[in-house]
Curated annotation (Swiss-Prot):
This is DNA replication and repair protein RecF. It comes from the Bacteria. It comes from Actinobacillus pleuropneumoniae serotype 7 (strain AP76). The gene is recF. GO terms for biological process: DNA replication; DNA synthesis involved in DNA repair; double-strand break repair; SOS response. Belongs to the RecF family. Its main location: cytoplasm. The RecF protein is involved in DNA metabolism; it is required for DNA replication and normal SOS inducibility. RecF binds preferentially to single-stranded, linear DNA. It also seems to bind ATP. One of its GO terms (molecular function) is ATP binding. ATP binds at residues 30-37.
Length: 360
């Protein structure tokens, strides 16, 4: 679902922008600090209700303003949506879809599936399991309508159980939580396992295209020993969990691991190879969504040239163009975009950014 128009007011140093966007490639060129990454951040915020750079909203609002406002028009065939979000310094958030209040961030996220590729995105590979669970859960959110409610209820029950561990004296007092928790844990873990298995050949095939010199393997770990009863594990671990003050084993510990030639990728790959593998994972997941759901996936790529050699840049650009996705790419100079053939397509848009102002 491409964005055809984007309006930004008081988002970081972007005080007032109204942009008509290409459904194909949108290139944003400017020096560091000019505001090009802030443009990607604003698009990401529209689709997630949060930033990929800061968890503190007041740092995102322009220093002379009391709020920021983002508005976009989404086009898909004969359908069109108008979406908007306002964030105030007080913390209040107003979200509208087609002029109507009462929507949730998850409603916006369903309308705007997007993948973001940034220099900080290597945490997907060298960070903790949290980042890789988020990777899996993004795909599940867009793949299965029932996943979000199961996942949200699971998080709620885990939070309640952890709080109860500080209060209960015997396991009998905790058991009602565990009955429901075990059911949801099994459901969510089965969804994760099925999705991981379906995505695995897509990842391996895409890795072969970009990294033929490496044998990349992927594996899903549900967070407790496979083939065992999670309800029994909760019961047996009660005293340990109570002593620690939280639930130590379960779906909140799940992981999606990547190995290169049999070894953990973070131990054997160079930083450039890790960057390329991260791009491959995002691309494979976005392409899988398009194939399964026949929906477009937006790609936000910050600092395109960073740590990718010209050949790999050209391969990535080729695959993105083949996918038919809407892509937003930032670069410091136009020369860094040469592998994207930006001069050759009249349907692409190129924006120059300087001190928060954009010109075509």
């Amino acid at each position: 679902m491409p964005l055809s128009r984007l309006i930004i007011n008081n988002f970081r140093n972007l005080q007032s922008l109204d942009l008509e966007l290409s459904p194909n490639f949108n290139f944003i060129v400017g020096h560091n600090g000019s505001g090009k990454t802030s443009l990607l951040e604003a698009i990401f915020y529209l689709g997630h209700g949060r930033s990929f750079k800061s968890h503190i909203s007041n740092r995102i609002i322009h220093y002379q303003a009391e709020d920021f406002v983002l508005h976009a028009r989404i086009d898909e065939g004969q359908h069109q949506w108008s979406v908007g979000i306002q964030k105030k310094r007080s913390g209040d958030t107003l979200l509208k879809i087609n002029g109507e209040d009462g929507n949730k961030i998850s409603d916006l996220a369903h309308l705007l599936p997007m993948q973001v590729i940034t220099p900080e995105g290597l945490t997907l590979l060298n960070g903790g399991p949290t980042f890789r669970r988020a990777f899996l859960d993004w795909g599940l959110f867009h793949q299965y309508t029932e996943f979000y409610s199961c996942w949200a209820n699971l998080k709620r029950l885990l939070k309640q159980r952890n709080a109860a561990l500080h209060q209960v004296r015997s396991y009998a007092e905790l058991k009602p939580w565990d009955i429901e928790l075990a059911k949801l844990a099994e459901i969510v873990s089965q969804m994760r396992a099925s999705y991981a298995e379906a995505l695995r050949p897509e990842i391996e095939k895409t890795c072969q295209f970009f990294l033929p010199e490496l044998e990349i393997g992927v594996s899903f770990h549900q967070g407790w020993e496979k083939g065992t009863d999670y309800a029994e594990i909760l019961a047996q671990g009660f005293e340990r969990d109570k002593a620690m003050g939280y639930t130590m084993i379960g779906p909140q510990k799940a992981d999606f691991r990547f190995r290169a030639n049999g070894l953990p990728v973070e131990d054997v790959l160079s930083r450039g190879q890790l960057k390329l593998l991260m791009c491959v994972l995002r691309l494979a997941q976005g392409e899988y969504l398009v194939a399964q759901k026949e929906r477009q996936c937006l790609f936000l790529i910050d600092d395109f040239a960073s740590e990718l050699d010209p050949i790999k840049r050209e391969l990535l650009a080729h695959r993105l163009r083949e996918s038919g996705s809407q892509v937003f790419v930032t670069a410091i100079t136009k020369d860094q975009l040469n592998q994207m053939q930006w001069q050759e397509s009249e349907q692409d848009s190129l924006f120059q950014v300087q001190q928060g102002m954009l010109t075509k």
